[in-house]
Swiss-Prot record:
Listed SUPFAM superfamilies: S-adenosyl-L-methionine-dependent methyltransferases, Winged helix' DNA-binding domain
Enzyme Commission no: 2.1.1.-
Record-level GO BP terms: indole glucosinolate metabolic process; methylation
The family this protein is said to belong to: Belongs to the class I-like SAM-binding methyltransferase superfamily. Cation-independent O-methyltransferase family.
Entry-linked PANTHER family: O-METHYLTRANSFERASE
Active site per database record: H278
Molecular function GO terms recorded: methyltransferase activity; O-methyltransferase activity; protein dimerization activity
Induction section of the entry: By the green peach aphid Myzus persicae.
Domain of life: Eukaryota
Repeat among keywords: no
Protein name: Indole glucosinolate O-methyltransferase 1
Length: 373
């Protein structure tokens, strides 16, 4: 049904509020102390399909839905009669973070109603083939596998060692995934790869003239699927471990090849390393890059797609927030992985034998960087 609605307002707008620096700092401190609520509610909303449900209604005139309507349209119908009430409480929080818009129906009981905000499209499960989805990344980040690792952070700072290994019997992340099919499948669905690559291809022309393109550590092959759809003359080789390729669909012009990038890399006139280097130590990165160098012709290149950390931690800078969030994620989950600065990428290129390192363009949070032979 359609709703006439008004914007939600403070329940008691005439109540005096003390405004001073100390009060503002106190409010910020309270928000930080309770920061765990938002990501956990976001995760539950994604698992329930709340955003997909709201987004499906967004193109219609009756784009606002009541919690009762949302509950009735979820992929799994709740058995709990209190589900609409609980959803309303979750959605209020999400609205305060601008994930959804909250209004109040003017008819009937004046209940709250909700509509998807534009940011929701980045979290839709149905958008995976179009732009990718951050939904799985949220779910992975708050899976027990990662949460158990985060719990080791204090002890790693005090005593040293590896956070993931301490939590998971000495195994590293990629070894662990070989033992946990559920988590491996979830992990391989994560990320924002398709959106980043599509955005980059709007301006990046570095694949023109490439005949054979190797995606080193290419996972399920979706990056090459996007590139070869724009450049159908390219032969794509999606190179990764057997366990990763087991979940890879077929793409026109793309061959899946199993192997280990620490041993050798298939020959190609250009290569992609997409969000691979941040998983590894500098020493491991040099090993990977040297293997790429050996398999490239003269004037060949590696197209590195990575986040670049700013030199300073600026207050209120969203790029700095993302960079340092991801850096801590790499520190805890990837046994020596880290995000890197421009200078650190230049040092990796030089140590691996490449003549120069060129920062070409930025797409969302990632940079397209060329390591040229």
């Amino acid at each position: 049904m359609g709703y006439l609605f008004q914007e939600t307002l403070s329940s008691n707008p005439k109540t005096p509020i003390v405004v001073d620096d100390d009060n503002e700092l106190g409010l910020m401190a309270v928000r930080l102390a309770n920061a765990a609520a938002f990501p956990m509610v976001l995760k539950a909303a994604l698992e329930l399909g709340v955003f997909d449900t709201l987004y499906a209604a967004a193109s219609r005139t009756d784009s606002f839905l009541s919690p009762y309507e949302i509950a009735s349209k979820l992929p799994t119908t709740p058995r709990n009669p209190e589900a609409p009430v609980l959803l309303d409480r979750m959605l209020r929080l999400l609205a305060s973070y601008s994930m959804v818009k909250c209004g109040k129906a003017l008819s009937g009981k004046g209940e709250r109603v909700y509509r998807a905000e534009p940011i929701c499209r980045f979290f839709l499960k149905d958008n995976i083939q179009d732009i990718g989805s951050l939904a799985s990344q949220v779910i992975v980040n708050f899976d027990s596998v990662f949460l158990n690792t985060w719990a080791q952070l204090k002890d790693v700072v005090l005593e040293g060692g590896d956070a993931f290994g301490r939590a998971h019997g000495g195994m590293k992340l990629f070894d662990y995934m070989g033992t946990d099919e559920r988590f491996s499948k979830l992990f391989n669905q994560t990320g924002f790869t398709i959106a980043v690559v599509k955005k980059a291809l709007e301006v990046y022309e570095g694949f023109k003239g490439v005949k054979v393109l190797v995606d080193v550590g290419g996972g399920v092959g979706n990056t090459l699927g996007v590139v070869t759809s724009k450049y159908p003359n390219i032969k794509g080789i999606n190179f990764d471990l057997t366990c990763a390729l087991a979940q890879a669909p077929s793409y026109p012009g793309v061959e899946h090849v199993a192997g280990d990038m620490f041993v050798d890399v298939p020959t190609g006139d250009a290569m992609i390393l997409k969000r691979i280097l941040h998983d590894w130590t500098d020493e491991d990165c040099v090993k990977i890059l040297k293997n790429c160098w050996k398999s490239l012709p003269e004037n060949g290149k590696v197209v590195v797609i990575e986040l670049v950390t700013p030199d300073e931690a600026e207050n209120g800078d969203i790029n700095a927030n993302i960079a340092f969030d991801m850096d801590m994620l790499m520190f805890t989950q990837c046994s020596g992985g880290k995000e890197r600065s421009r200078a650190e990428f230049e040092a990796l290129a030089a140590a691996s034998g490449f003549t120069h390192c060129k920062f070409v363009c930025q797409a969302y949070h990632c940079w397209i960087i060329e390591f040229c032979k």
